[in-house]
């Protein structure tokens, strides 16, 4: 019985199955943790959702920003971008079932026995575990409710970017969503910066990666995150594990077996995502992952 943690899949089903075959994954006995962004950019978002859903209780996943964007597109709130390659999913006969299943998935996983915390982007240094769980439950509650389109319509935006217990309503939900699914850099006081997508060594002062700031989460807990492919899993402190290694961009899909902390990788079979606009082309010239 093993615990396997895998980074952002982004519609790369073949690589996911090949990686699981490397470790002889058995859903009857093993548990699979997924850092979110199951969909978009890769060729098989529909089949990834079908497969992950079929695993039932063997899966512990969190939603990523691309998963939330899919929900917004399906609800008619956001535009379907061709580069996301989700049209087959949107038009699938079981799309309603898959979308309703997806929106009932958590944005945070905490396992007190394994001392593991997982969120797509990480945990803001302004939160302790209890606050993170409270804010995650609030987001999950509205996503699973009939009023979820109202939340999806309001979730886009970078403000507020500073945590306060006094935040309420949609502003509070937007901060929590950004902290859990979009965060990369923070100011020294823990305030989120939602603009910079650079690598840590190229980020302007005084910005720091969220994991370099003092944290309120107990050091007894390890934090698992995805989202930040340009890190390639490197440069993070002890007890922090970044698992997005850019499979859909021609990198790898990475798996961490928790019991012995052994890594397994599956190289991308081909580059699946395309760089399509001037901003992305300019960013990619500086850093091929900066536009994620």
UniProtKB/Swiss-Prot annotation:
Protein name: Bis(5'-nucleosyl)-tetraphosphatase, symmetrical
NCBIfam families recorded: apaH, PRK00166.1
UniProt entry keywords in alphabetical sequence: Hydrolase
Gene Ontology molecular-function annotations: bis(5'-nucleosyl)-tetraphosphatase (symmetrical) activity
HAMAP family assigned to the protein according to its UniProt record, in alphabetical order: ApaH
Catalytic activity: P(1),P(4)-bis(5'-adenosyl) tetraphosphate + H2O = 2 ADP + 2 H(+)
Domain of life: Bacteria
Species per Swiss-Prot/TrEMBL record: Yersinia enterocolitica serotype O:8 / biotype 1B (strain NCTC 13174 / 8081)
Highest classification ranks of the organism: Bacteria, Pseudomonadati, Pseudomonadota, Gammaproteobacteria, Enterobacterales
